[in-house]
A protein has these predicted regions:
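Short, glycine/small-hydrophobic-rich surface segments
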Residues: 61-94
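Short, conserved loop/turn and helix-capping segments at secondary-structure boundaries
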Residues: 47, 51, 78-81, 153, ...
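N-terminal leader/signal peptides at the extreme start of proteins
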Residues: 1-7
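Exposed loop/turn and edge beta-strand positions of beta-sandwich/beta-sheet ligand-binding modules
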Residues: 12, 118, 179
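Short linear sequence signals and composition-biased patches located at protein termini or domain-edge surfaces
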Residues: 153-243
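Type IV pilin-like appendage domain
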Residues: 83-176, 206-209, 236
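Short helix/strand-bridging catalytic loops that position acidic/His residues to coordinate divalent metals
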Residues: 38-43, 148-154, 201-204
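Aliphatic-rich helix starts adjacent to a transmembrane/signal segment
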Residues: 7-63
Length: 243
């Protein structure tokens, strides 16, 4: 009787089938886990990015202000201006003491009881793009004309090209003779890259959207409205010059 020195074809096929039964589910589990991990990182990144954007917007709005017009009542609507063009692009603009390094250079244009401060102008632009549901959010800083860093067209920065929705809404609450004005900020960001949506590699109906909201207190405005008759040093004239 001879000893068997090799596997038969049937035995090899049985071994291969058993290995496939083990490998295929394992591969699917690992593949699904990898995709889930990547998706988790994407969503975590977009949440952190949205929080950074809200922090920047909040900083700009909390230091917002308005030109002084004697004899007129002042409200949050003096600060805020919004326009929409024929293409659906939205531009939100307001004056503010915010503006990077310039914040530490807010100096009076004259001495005395009414010393004007110079303002910067900031624009947030929500731009629609052809062929994609993604919008672009830009921030443009126009430094006061007397500032050495001021330049025509302002300092433009793209904040995000993954925007679904962006809104700043001014509101005022009145009670017992006092009022409190504030801004409601709403922001929605996609967790996918805009180029992927344009190429059709993702389903726009299944994209994860991270939603953010914040309320912002315009400190200077509320202080002036609720403390009438105080020194007007923090009123400002954006067109004031040295002299």
């Amino acid at each position: 009787m001879k000893n068997r020195q090799a596997f038969t074809l049937i035995e090899l096929m049985v071994v291969v089938c058993i290995l496939m039964l083990v490998i295929i589910p394992t591969y699917r589990i690992l593949s699904h886990g990898s995709k889930s991990a990547i998706k988790g990182v994407q969503r975590n990144n977009i949440i952190m990015h949205g929080q950074q954007l809200l922090s920047q917007i909040k900083s700009d709005l909390s230091a917002s202000a308005f030109p002084l017009v004697d004899g007129e009542m002042h409200s949050i609507n003096n600060i805020f201006n919004e326009t929409t063009d024929s293409g659906g692009n939205i531009k939100i603009s307001f004056y503010t003491f915010s503006g990077g390094k310039y914040e530490n250079q807010v100096i009076p244009t004259s001495s005395g009881g009414m010393a004007y401060r110079r303002l910067n102008k900031i624009e947030y632009r929500l731009i629609s793009k052809s062929g994609t549901i993604f919008k672009t959010l830009e921030r443009v800083v126009f430094l006061h004309p007397s500032h050495p860093g001021a330049k025509a067209g302002g300092q433009r920065k793209v904040l995000s090209d993954k925007v679904n929705f962006f809104e700043i809404r001014p509101e005022t609450i009145k009670s017992a003779g006092f009022s409190r004005s504030f801004f409601r900020v709403s922001l929605q960001l996609f967790d996918q890259d805009s180029s992927a949506a344009k190429s059709g590699s993702i389903d726009p109906d299944k994209v994860f959207i991270a939603e953010f909201s914040e309320t912002v207190n315009p400190l200077i405005l509320n202080s002036i409205i609720n403390n009438p008759g105080l020194n007007r040093n923090w009123y400002t004239d954006p067109s004031a010059t040295d002299g």
